[in-house]
């Protein structure tokens, strides 16, 4: 018999000296009439012991702290051996919560346990966005979190409806996922399973063999993220009219059309020599460099005390640098920089194939373009979650919670633990091709480029640039979508900018449009780490390095659980 599954949520107090759950809610996934809303954590945990089901909280890192705190204070201890009256967790070294597995004992050989998962790992969006994007027949509401609610507080009709909506939105969304066969712990795992189902597990294991941990560690040194760069020419200055374009499904489009590695790599010494059987390669290289005039910098060096980790470099400084580079990255660097004192050390070479992901991407692109609501959003999730799964870190050493003397949770690093890599070379080359796509387009617009962010280019002026004029389309895979045209803008740093965007009213909503069609402008604030509350205080006049405001919630572990303390946010 399959286990029942429930969507759950807590509402909690906001005082450091009175941290507790004042309301809980649970609703059965696939049976929305089976739900309950109550006001006692003890009552909820009694139900958890009796139900022995799979529960989902949206952002388990927050709600899970109250559960683990309760378990510790009621005699349960952490253990990964499945002993009675113990609990196990999956919490990453970065503090991401994935699971709590509470074992109550055994009936014969059958384990009596309740497993709690994080629905945010399957649906990585706020509840309000899930309701909107999935076109669910209810929307997330609002309540005043700071209202006094003493122990035994009687839940008001408004609070009851708010909690019920929250758990129902997630219950409906997860039910849709599960009915599509998407039943893994994370969106990435769902996507990888879907790809294996199309390719077949047998062929997957042959095409993407397991590499040794030492080899994976070396190859992983060539793995880099998206290209995010602000042109110094426009930094901290108000800019006039401009345009923003972004690539439709950047990573899936590279997976669809670019030559990508497969099979076991071959190690080579020195400089890579052309090999038609193994045309893709990762080169370990030591060199000095100087940016050419009129070129965008593309070299970024992390975990090095001589360089800022988020800065793209114009020169190598006083000493040569050593990098692991795909042939895609290396060719781009050779075009953008003068290289000196080059030493080719060694590397890995790979067979190549185009179209490995064609059937998978065709399937989900069709759903994305022909469906609306939930199915469309699930298709986007499947398309965008796969590439990163290939480069999953095999080091899965986690954190273990424990109860400190003051009653709050502490965390220690657990025993070292590793899993098999998936196939890191694939993640390395997909991201390399993605950077190549964005950088090549930006470089062709060198006289206009303001800013790049992974899949987007921001340009001065209102003319479509020559390099993309024939590949502009709002939906086609790999084409550039014209996202917006702005009247004015100001960029301070990566992921920190504001724009007045030209808009017009369509069916009662403001839609981006050209300057000629515009009836007004919409003020847009993009700033990593800034809450919506603080964004409402931003203007063109005060948006600058040093801008400071209260309104950033900072989680603090206290006796009983977690309190979100109001703290200062500053643009640095």
From Swiss-Prot:
Residues at the site labelled Probably involved in binding template-primer structures: 249, 384, 388, 431, 435, 495, 497
One Gene Ontology MF term: metal ion binding
Interaction with the primer terminal protein: annotated segments: 56-66
EC number from the UniProt entry: 2.7.7.7, 3.1.11.-
DNA-binding as annotated region, ranges: 223-226
Site for Stabilizes the primer-terminus at the polymerization active site and contributes to the coordination between the exonuclease and polymerazation activities, residues: 526
Positions annotated to bind Mg(2+) 2: 246-247, 453, 455
Keywords, ordered alphabetically: DNA replication, DNA-binding, DNA-directed DNA polymerase, Early protein, Exonuclease, Hydrolase, Magnesium, Metal-binding, Nuclease, Nucleotide-binding, Nucleotidyltransferase, Transferase, Viral DNA replication
Protein's GO biological process: DNA replication; viral DNA genome replication
Residues holding 5-methyl-UTP: 251, 368, 380, 455
Swiss-Prot/TrEMBL site (Probably involved in nucleotide binding selection) positions: 251, 380, 387
Job of this protein: Polymerase responsible for protein-primed viral DNA replication by strand displacement with high processivity and fidelity.
Record-stated family: Belongs to the DNA polymerase type-B family.
Protein's recorded name: DNA polymerase
Natural source organism: Bacillus phage M2 (Bacteriophage M2)
Lineage: Viruses, Duplodnaviria, Heunggongvirae, Uroviricota, Caudoviricetes
Gene: G
